[in-house]
Each structure stands twice: as structure tokens, then as C-alpha cells.
Amino acid sequence: MSEANAGTNAKTDVVLVGAGIMSATLGTLIKLLEPNWSITMIERLDGAAAESSDPWNNAGTGHSALCELNYTPALPDGTIDISKAVNVNEQFQVSRQFWAHAVENGVLPDVRSFLNPVPHVSFVYGADNVQYLKARYNALVTNPLFASMEFIDDKDEFTRRLPLMAEKRDFSEPVALNWSQHGTDVDFGSLSRQLIGFAAGNGMTTMFGHDVRDLSKNSDGSWTVKVRNRRTGNNFKINAKFVFVGAGGGALPLLQKSGIPEAKGFGGFPVGGAFLRTNKQHLTSRHNAKVYGLPPLGAPPMSVPHLDTRVINGRQWLLFGPFAGWSPKFLKQGKVTDLPLSVKPNNLASMLGVGLTEVGLLKYLIGQLLLSEPARVETLREFAPSAVDSDWELDIAGQRVQVIRRKGAGGVLEFGTTVLAAADGSIAGLLGASPGASTAVPAMLDVLQRCFADRYQAWTPKLKEMVPSLGTKLSDEPKLFEEVWSWGTKVLKLDVQANTAEAANAPATV
């Protein structure tokens, strides 16, 4: 569909709003299931995956709960609750299987540009924290999904595996690691672009530099999508049977405009992020891992500090952060009016309720905003004691819009990803952040099941080709897990170290 003929009578089966990982995944799934359906993707920026899916705008961990300590809280009796970690990892396994199927079938032609083997590591110091990490290891290692995890509290082994973090470290204070060798670094920008390339090559229309201005429901259950060309100012309409709003932080305002009751009461709280980064070879060659620590006292889950190996455009980088920022924008390239305009009569109580109850978050944000450049590097020295200010530069990352959900007379801030769908299945959208991109495949399968309930059963055999474990908890099926894991590892070339990364266990000198 060209803009010239996209007048009031232009029709499409599916409109995807946004060209990030969620829309890219859903568009590909639909093209594989229903090749003849017409799909139109509308993106306000001039390129795909330029907001939260861009590798510089997210951590690229491919959240699999191997190293993120906020997924394994200690209970008052000292035991570790691993339920959230298992749930997140189960979701990541679904995405991993789909990516393997896509590589095997030519949907994703360049696996190494978006997926690289990088160990995932949890790091703590101090006797009490070491005790917690040992308990975490004992709780997780009995689960098939985490069975290969190692516990390391030996100074020499720590130094061998993480030479940069060992340099100038005072080992008189106990340290410990949970080491998961089979982690990955994911470039969700490259992954999104390849998925969109496949869908576009199979008939999907892409409209970049176009803004969705409004959505209105028609009497026949379809939607009229009002679109503006940001370059020419030309306005036009598209009629769609189904609309998916995958516009990242821009999803909430559009879902509010749709008027669906399911969106009522929801609000959004934008949190910015920044990382210190370096590509200096004398640093990148001595650190090959994503190392996550404990969040500062009173800080929200998205503030967990981590020192990460990233592989972006074939080059190895180190990123440390996140450092929180604040802006009323819902997108990195959004407007300062995004937050105030999102406040509606139906979510005002939710928004005010969060403002009154999340005092810890507000204190944390204020403290982060006051950090100087030297203070940021000082925080980095908890991980890399030898860090030198001049080796690192600041990267302003993307905006995260955390979900505010109605609770009682007020509201509660949620840290997670929420799929909203209308009761009739004609429109759906995605809100929230972590674990976000790495759960794109299960999230979009959820959209398909909820919005195309009449077709989902007929699609299931094809979906099981794409995700062999579909509908099965792999943590309950060790044999099936081993089969799909081995297959995925081979197809995704994760058994071969990337040229750009140093071998994780190579002997190192400090």
C-alpha cells in the first residue's frame, strides 16, 4: 500500500504500530501463519528499532533470569523464592526456540549480528550477601533450566574469570559469583530489522516517518487508523480488521485514544536511563561477561547495576549502569507533554496513588539526577576498582514507561510487561518494560491466542514447529529441555565463540 492510494478506503487486515521488537515479532508470526494476510507497519521514526529496541537504548541481556538478582528474592526465613526466575527463563526459552526455527528456515539470515555467547554472572561482596548467593545457587541448580550454574567464592578463580574486576580489588572482603556459562548478548535492533525484512519481503507494507494520530472503532468491529506523514504533513486513514500497538512508551496514549475499557485506569511512569560505555581494547579484552550486582537499598528493580559485554555491529563494548534519569517523555524522541497528556479522569487516582506511595523511588531518582560524572565512575569502581574516568563516556539510553495499574482507590507501580487486549480481540497493545524484549515471542503468542481465539487451535501445529515446547513447562520436562536446548545451541551457533569476544575461561593475567 503506497501513501498515494492510502485514502479513506485503504484497507488492510493488520496494522502494526511501531517498528520495534514486538511488532517485528508479531508481523513475522502472522506472515508465517497466514501468508496471504495484508499487514501494514507504521513507524513514526525514519528507521526500524530506533527506540527501546536499539542496542544503545537497552541492556541487551536477553533477560533469562540467570543473573538478575531481583528475580530471586530472599524470604524472611532465609529461603530463596525462585518462581519469578523460573517463569522469566521459561519465557526466554520460547523466544530462543523461535529464533532457532527462524534461523533454520531463512527468516533470520545473520544470527551472529544479533546473538552472541556471553556468560551471565551474579556478583556480590560482603559475608551476608555471599551467604545469600550460595542459597540462591542451591535453590536454582536443582532446576533443569539452571542446572549448569556454578558457585564461585575463590579469589583465584574470580581473578581468572573476571580479570578486569579483580584488578586492584581488596579481597579481604568476601566475594562470590553465580556463573552461567551459556548466557547470551542480544542486539534487539538487528533482530528486529531482520524480522521486518522477512515480513516486508513477503508482502508487508512499511511506512516509516508516519505518525498514528488517532484510532476509532467502526460499527463492523474494524478500526479506522488516522495517520500523518511527518515529512509532508499529509493526513490519511487506513481501515484495519486488527490493530497491534507495539509503540513502546507511545503505546499508552494510543490505547487511551482507542477508548477500550481494558485501558482505563492504567497510567505510565517514565524513567530514563544512562550507561557508561567504553570500547578500549585493554578493557574489553579483560571482561567477557554480563555481571549483575545487588540494587542499592530502596532502589527499584530496574536499577540493578551491571557491567556488561556488548557486541554491537561486530564490535565489543563494555557498558555499566543503569543510571536513572527523569523526563516526562514516553519515548527518547517523544514530547515533554507525553506524561501530562496521559493523565485522564479514569487514571488520575492511580497516578496520584503511586506518587504518594513510591517515596523510595522518588528519592532514588533525585539522588541519581544529582550524580556527577566522577560519582558515576566511582559507582563503577564497585565492579571494576581500577576504572579510570577518561576511559569511559556517557550513553543516554531509552525511556522506560513503567505500568501504573489501578489498585483499590489508588494505584500501584508495576515492573514488568503487560499485554492489553480488547474483549473482542480487535486491538491489543503492550505496556511496560523488563523483562521486555527477550519475552517478545511468548508475549506475541499471548496476543495471537487472545485476539484470534477462533483460529489459534488451527495454528497450533504450525506454532509447535516454530516453538517445539509450546504449552509445556520445560522446567518440568528435563529431557525435552535438553533436546530443544541442544538444537537451539547448534542452530544459533552458540557453541562457537564469537570472534569479537574473548574466550570466557581463557587464562588471564592481572
From Swiss-Prot:
Pathway(s): Carbohydrate metabolism; tricarboxylic acid cycle; oxaloacetate from (S)-malate (quinone route): step 1/1
Documented EC number(s): 1.1.5.4
Record-linked Gene3D superfamilies: FAD/NAD(P)-binding domain
Key word Oxidoreductase present: yes
Origin superkingdom: Bacteria
GO BP: tricarboxylic acid cycle
Catalytic activity as recorded in UniProt: (S)-malate + a quinone = a quinol + oxaloacetate
SUPFAM superfamilies assigned to the protein according to its UniProt record, in alphabetical order: FAD/NAD(P)-binding domain (SSF51905)
Keywords: FAD, Flavoprotein, Oxidoreductase, Tricarboxylic acid cycle
Cofactors (names): FAD
GO molecular function: 2-hydroxyglutarate dehydrogenase activity; L-malate dehydrogenase (quinone) activity
Family stated for the protein in its record: Belongs to the MQO family.
HAMAP family to which the protein is assigned, alphabetical: MQO
PANTHER family reported for this sequence: L-2-HYDROXYGLUTARATE DEHYDROGENASE, MITOCHONDRIAL
Name by which UniProt lists this protein: Probable malate:quinone oxidoreductase
